[in-house]
């Protein structure tokens, strides 16, 4: 029998080109895709409930006879059908209806309908029920299984998806959908047969535990989640092997430049910086590409570690590229590296999207001629950027860069043959759960020591009814010679509205604090204008900076000791932690005021409570993952990572240790099963194996 992964959806009855196109929109191209497109939830239509026994809020199947159908005129015209079954009367209400529909619901018609029961003006009602007429004497049986509700898209009805899954299930068997988990592994980890799991999840029996299914703890769900997580783990192991099989430039440990750099620095690196620096120096001296993630909490001194790595490559005669996700952050790196490297006679080149014309041409020429240190934004990934001898790529805040961009960078190595070493830095600590799954292809170093002189930030929650007091607090801090940030957060995912809110707040604060010099920075300003404002704030010419979350990452103004964050309940914990990290960079006591808008939801209260209790980024990251889930944390929208079909990282975290062991066993004893698994679960993700 043909494998269902090879059979297109057009082989199903009723699927022509137009429907195939709609199915492709939700990633359904083969019969295997249809079978792995699992229901989100289930409805119980296996029993008929008497009208007299109905309760508001319940979903129910009801049978009865139409006692009348009238058009009701009110604020909205609706068709009201009265249904009786001997135990009571129920109204069916339709706001969208045709004359033909009204004619089909005439008095005496026998109906079976399904929907949510609600209280109405004249007793219980169901709005827009699904219904069918029961004609003739032959009874039509109720559903034999729970009814699946599938993820869908415009133009794809539940009815249609159920018909298609029914046809695909009829073709399902061990030969049409091979089980690539060896029997021994399945036995060791108590995993049931694949085809039985899929059959169960599409059509659970009437006595299935709906709650267990809703929580994702049923054996059939765990069987599929295990296989999906296992495949993801295998893809990362493959990725690692692929990278290791390539040659990279060998960069011997340097001494001359790092010594001079540290002497000029004016402070001693922390023990953690020295330890991580040594791990990186060892990796760079090998002839296989380094893939190392350096995690450090806000202010842990990752940039110094990156500079030491860069000097090792430069002393060996190679080029280094440092990329940051925003122009503000890239510019900050450029200024830092210029300050550190120019005294060592090392040229630092700059390339960002805003460079145009002659300046851009000159920058490209310098890079092509071998400028040792190149700093920029994602503009460095573009085809026209040609490096002479790129040996090390430093990527700041990696999960803001997409997989494609990491690929593009790989191809810019020495002569297109040697693969550059990659050092990835993030100030968003990655929870262990995610590190075990999403970043299993990277070696990890942790900077767990803050440099001396950093002060902890005192965080307080204040309701926005006390806004005037908060404004006075800003005045007092600025009078003492300190500086402050006032952050306006995202409004309904609209950058435009957020920028307008920032402008309004800027006008309000400029008027209330007339004697202070107030600046404004938001995402819609031109990069050059943003840079001017940031520079003025850094130099102390502005005392208060009103900003949107564009200042979240990497901005360093040691004299700023007060931050006000408006509507903090709209942000995730990791983002709040990043914002708070902009203060507490000097020796003065620093404060962060979370100016919230009551009433707070339960999650909002928990989230802000965590911010008040801890400043440990790793604790915050674990909590953020619990409250938000992995996709948001990793910025999956651009990484293509971790968009699982069945698995859920938080829910299935306890499977991960077993999944890792199973991946090792499979690679060691059944390597021939790896490719079919990758093809099944990551069919469109094969290019990620190149990253």
Predicted stretch roles:
Residues 72-264, 636, 669:
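Upstream accessory/linker segments immediately N-terminal to the RecA-like ATPase cores of bacterial MutS
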Residues 1-12, 21-24, 231-232, 242:
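Long, highly charged, low-complexity intrinsically disordered interaction regions
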Residues 599-691:
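C-terminal accessory region of SF2 helicases/translocases
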Residues 275-278, 289-610, 624, 665, ...:
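Inter-lobe coupling/hinge segments of SF2-like helicase ATPases
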Residues 267-277:
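N-terminal pre-Walker A segment at the start of P-loop NTPase domains
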